[in-house]
Amino acid sequence: MIEWIIRRSVANRFLVLMGALFLSIWGTWTIINTPVDALPDLSDVQVIIKTSYPGQAPQIVENQVTYPLTTTMLSVPGAKTVRGFSQFGDSYVYVIFEDGTDPYWARSRVLEYLNQVQGKLPAGVSAELGPDATGVGWIYEYALVDRSGKHDLADLRSLQDWFLKYELKTIPDVAEVASVGGVVKEYQVVIDPQRLAQYGISLAEVKSALDASNQEAGGSSIELAEAEYMVRASGYLQTLDDFNHIVLKASENGVPVYLRDVAKVQVGPEMRRGIAELNGEGEVAGGVVILRSGKNAREVIAAVKDKLETLKSSLPEGVEIVTTYDRSQLIDRAIDNLSGKLLEEFIVVAVVCALFLWHVRSALVAIISLPLGLCIAFIVMHFQGLNANIMSLGGIAIAVGAMVDAAIVMIENAHKRLEEWQHQHPDATLDNKTRWQVITDASVEVGPALFISLLIITLSFIPIFTLEGQEGRLFGPLAFTKTYAMAGAALLAIVVIPILMGYWIRGKIPPESSNPLNRFLIRVYHPLLLKVLHWPKTTLLVAALSVLTVLWPXNKVGGEFLPQINEGDLLYMPSTLPGISAAEAASMLQKTDKLIMSVPEVARVFGKTGKAETATDSAPLEMVETTIQLKPQDQWRPGMTMDKIIEELDNTVRLPGLANLWVPPIRNRIDMLSTGIKSPIGIKVSGTVLADIDTMAEQIEEVARTVPGVASALAERLEGGRYINVEINREKAARYGMTVADVQLFVTSAVGGAMVGETVEGIARYPINLRYPQSWRDSPQALRQLPILTPMKQQITLADVADVKVSTGPSMLKTENARPTSWIYIDARDRDMVSVVHDLQKAIAEKVQLKPGTSVAFSGQFELLERANHKLKLMVPMTLMIIFVLLYLAFRRVGEALLIISSVPFALVGGIWLLWWMGFHLSVATGTGFIALAGVAAEFGVVMLMYLRHAIEAEPSLNNPQTFSEQKLDEALYHGAVLRVRPKAMTVAVIIAGLLPILWGTGAGSEVMSRIAAPMIGGMITAPLLSLFIIPAAYKLMWLHRHRVRK
């Protein structure tokens, strides 16, 4: 089959070259137009349900809103995890779906089940779906700053809410623009309880009057002078004077009682659950641009920047927009870095080819397969919808060396056969027809084995395709693009390369002996191989012992899920205890931001505590998320690295009650979505009794702090909230003609503040709040004395119908699959994650006694690593079996297939030793490198064995038991090994040379790519060295055994 394809391609070379030209043009177009991003979208398919229940405590929100929603969503088809968050005034439910679920199908199913549960929610409470965005949709953030002092926080927030937000939402593929920080303007109707009692007016009557005085109505239309006039009765509240003139009732003598008689109307700030701060200089308002799921981040960011630039002229004087996070910077750095590495690889591979072949046109034949293979890979990427990112380009990068292997072997074999033809016909001139015939025969001779070897490299990535969840989404693009590139190289090797050889390998072909590099290789290899063939069993014993040397470094190498990717920015997410006030949170935020700005490498600090106005942010007030923009690396102090910056920040920011955590922004948001945990290691304690969960979480926190490598550990306190409980006495309330609902309505309105509508001021809408003065509700004693007007117009106090007590309770409730859960956040440093977790598990098992009904589960990146390891343990052996079958089909002998498979362990030797030497941990990235190494090592074995077989087949006496001799066998093995050392050395050299730029790279994304390249380079140093000696030695023993059997 392969022979037929080669011969038909050469026969129809014009059509093949036209097809190659078409592919190159099409591929160039796709390369230019392929969307780019920094990383693949690693987030799970999620649908967020946000429900506002203003003024309600977390326990009430959990009981009345979150619990009905989470229990219903557990039945949604395809849902694998349902997380609930109940906090003050808001409920968030995250429905996480299985991989491969269509996001819009998921939204429709959630909406369907949401309609079923809507009737179980409290009156007036309505759940809504969050934006169709992923967990990493926060692509651009900005702050509004007024350095002139002309505009306060309320003005800045209004500018964001009613101008910038709507302008930016018009940009295609922007799912949402969330406001954060600043102050929302609010009309506050502050009731004087004494004046209210004096006039005998209840709170309910005030609410009714406010509602009735803030409406507009239409009166149809009338005709005047042959024209239509629409009738409108204006009634919106627009000024404080409008509020003051609201009539509440008329006295007995007909004098109206106005709102101003019983209340003070003022403009003030709405209760805040989110605060933003810039550079430690003070509070600001800001916005977050959220990308629609699956769209092009860089294009959208560019459109956002252009839009903001055009809007600058429309901003009030003194107001400026400051960019506080811009993912396009990371995208550009990552793509530029990987593109540069690919170019370096191309150049290095070209130099290696030229040095070995010692013929420029022959080297060009091998080199041209690289851009053609790249075009094929990008064309398939385009149809699959893959974008260009660190991982997809990385797949091509690790394939570059192997892509030219087949071309190299074919070219070298063509050189050899042309040299032999000249030797056999010293007086003849090689005409065009004969040259094409020699080159075609040379291609057919090695083509099938090379095609099988490239197929083996392609199939070696099957385990990567089977990875699930986040690890599958991260390494899937790498596996796809490497597969496409290798498949393209295999196709080119049997279709295009023979044709290019026929056109370009012309004129005087320098003999192999004229190349000093080749002479050096033969001079070194020759005596060593003679010794190996003289003592084949000793050679195999030494090789087996060399494999055992990996036991020492393997025990020293730690484990992790993925290395920390340097995104160029940092996220400061300290863990704090709950119950902090808004004023204290703002003060703490400014202090930490100011300390962070003191580090010279920091360019800008955008601090956020609490949440932005979006369903994608469920942060409670005590959760700090500070985005740190760093200066370009060339502006850092000499010797500074990201690790050193984090260490200096950690030593600088030291405030009581804060457990520091420094994480990359994208990585953190991915982890929080997939596992719910913001730290690399997390422990989830689940149960039914909140007190038991709290006790266990605190015990685990104490134990965790004693484990080596744990930098910080903090358990959430479920019972850390402070409550003032109003316990209604039903009997006493009944004596005054009041129900429990009447008292609750009074507490909600007078203490919590009732939202009684909003003003309409152009396109702006501002809330109206009704409540008692601060002095009447600032202590339990003041609450007890709150006056109540009963339905029978009696004046009583709250203490007459209820007991007011101070207690503790949950500040925020979290559930996973409807079970209450507490999370312990653990940050590990100076030690690998796997070792820390193993010690943690041991310490918890020994020192923490589980209470009945509770359970402990490790989460975070460790959970993802365990899942990936489990999958690879199943799939790697299966893949080796598939490779073995392919080898058997190629050589038709079990022994020869086993011989090549046995070379794979020798590749591990160099890979593990290089990992240890470079200080890398075992991870999914290094595992990917080892899997790629297995395919390349098998390919080298195929090439080696192919030449040995050809040499033996060229000596007919070896197949005859009567003429067989060990001396002739050694001579054949010598010819197959030493005289064909050039293509083997080239195969190794181009792979190592192609990977070195990746290993030594330091730019964005190099943390992952270097760990993929390290085991491949280490393995390609030891595997070929051992295989150059082991395969001839083992093959000799195999033939000697075969000869004894024949005799």
Swiss-Prot record:
Keyword match Transport: yes
Disulfide cysteine pairs (residue numbers): none
Q: Does the keyword Transmembrane helix apply?
A: yes
What are the alphabetically sorted keywords of the record? Cell inner membrane, Cell membrane, Copper, Copper transport, Ion transport, Membrane, Transmembrane, Transmembrane helix, Transport
- Annotated coiled-coil segments of the chain: none
Q: Which domain of life is it from?
A: Bacteria
Write out the annotated subcellular location.
Cell inner membrane
Question: Record's family?
Answer: Belongs to the resistance-nodulation-cell division (RND) (TC 2.A.6) family.
Name of the molecule in the record: Cation efflux system protein CusA
Q: What organism, scientifically named, is this protein from?
A: Escherichia coli O6:H1 (strain CFT073 / ATCC 700928 / UPEC)
